[in-house]
C-alpha cells in the first residue's frame, strides 16, 4: 500500500509540474506575440511618419490650446492609442 501511495504522489506531482510548465509556456508565448506585434506596429507608425502628423495637427490649433495639449501629452497619448489599435488589428487578423 505504501508503494502505491508513493507512486500516486509521484504521478500527481509530475502532472502538477507539467501543467504549471505548460501554463507558463502559454503565458510567455502570448507575451512574446503581443510584444512582437507592438514593435511591428511601432515600425509601421515610424514608416508612415504618423507621429509628426499628429504634432502638426495639434500645432494648427491656436497657441493656447496647442500648448495645453502638448503639456498634457495628448500627442503621445494619441500615438500610443493608435499603436494599440494597430496591434489589436494585427492580433485579430491572425486570430490570436
Curated annotation (Swiss-Prot):
Main location: secreted
Coiled coil: none
Compartments, record wording: Secreted; Host cell membrane
A cellular component annotation (GO) from this entry: extracellular region
An annotated Gene Ontology molecular function: toxin activity
Keyword Nucleus: no
Transmembrane segments: 76-96
Keywords in alphabetical order: Enterotoxin, Host cell membrane, Host membrane, Membrane, Secreted, Toxin, Transmembrane, Transmembrane helix, Virulence
Superkingdom classification of source: Bacteria
Function: Increases short-circuit current in rabbit ileal tissue mounted in Ussing chambers, by increasing the potential difference. Cultures of V.cholerae containing the cloned ace gene cause fluid secretion in ligated rabbit ileal loops.
Protein name: Accessory cholera enterotoxin
Organism the protein comes from: Vibrio cholerae serotype O1 (strain ATCC 39315 / El Tor Inaba N16961)
Organism lineage string: Bacteria, Pseudomonadati, Pseudomonadota, Gammaproteobacteria, Vibrionales
Protein's gene: ace
Amino acid at each position: 500500500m505504501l508503494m502505491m501511495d508513493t507512486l500516486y504522489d509521484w504521478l500527481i506531482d509530475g502532472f502538477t509540474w507539467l501543467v504549471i510548465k505548460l501554463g507558463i509556456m502559454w503565458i510567455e508565448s502570448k507575451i512574446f506575440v503581443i510584444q512582437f506585434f507592438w514593435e511591428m506596429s511601432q515600425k509601421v507608425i515610424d514608416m508612415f511618419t504618423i507621429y509628426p502628423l499628429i504634432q502638426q495637427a495639434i500645432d494648427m490649433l491656436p497657441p493656447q490650446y496647442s500648448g495645453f495639449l502638448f503639456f498634457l501629452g495628448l500627442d503621445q497619448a494619441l500615438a500610443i492609442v493608435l499603436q494599440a489599435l494597430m496591434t489589436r488589428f494585427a492580433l485579430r487578423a491572425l486570430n490570436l
